[in-house]
Amino acid sequence: MRLNTLSPAAGSKPEKQRRGRGIGSGLGKTGGRGVKGQTSRSGGGKVRAGFEGGQMPLKIRLPKFGFFSRKSLVSAEVRLNEIAMVEGDVVDLSTLKQAGVVTKNIVFAKVVLSGNIDRAVTVRGVSVTKGARAAIEAAGGKIEE
């Protein structure tokens, strides 16, 4: 016995039905497609997502709202516990990028009160929230605008 000589037992697999080959086959005439309509046609039923057959699509019926701020693509929030990952006493945009806290495309960063900081750091050129400012100054650090 070899792998290339194996075949299924006789009668274990039904023969493929040939569509549209007469009434006696059970799938004659319309071949299981029903009568008329888009899905009965060759290549029919393939429509793009959101297409509603010519009816005004839901996406267009609903009103437009809001906008996408492009500044959000170049802005980031920095938590206090992420500042602890920065080596050295001075924290600015370049040191945050070197430490991998923010990505290289970030232009604006803001330190927010989340987590805690246990060492004195000087935050330079990065905006800081009131709560984060209090926490940094309580740890002996300072903020330079």
Curated annotation (Swiss-Prot):
Residue ranges, compositional bias (Gly residues): 22-35
Example GO molecular function: structural constituent of ribosome
Annotated keywords: Ribonucleoprotein, Ribosomal protein, RNA-binding, rRNA-binding
Positions of the UniProt region annotated as Disordered: 1-50
GO BP: translation
Gene Ontology CC: one annotated term: cytosolic large ribosomal subunit
Domain of life of the source: Bacteria
Matching HAMAP family: Ribosomal_uL15
Function comment: Binds to the 23S rRNA.
Family named by the database record: Belongs to the universal ribosomal protein uL15 family.
Quaternary structure annotation from Swiss-Prot or TrEMBL: Part of the 50S ribosomal subunit.
PANTHER family: 50S RIBOSOMAL PROTEIN L15 (PTHR12934), LARGE RIBOSOMAL SUBUNIT PROTEIN UL15M (PTHR12934:SF11)
Record's protein name: Large ribosomal subunit protein uL15
Species, as recorded: Aeromonas salmonicida (strain A449)
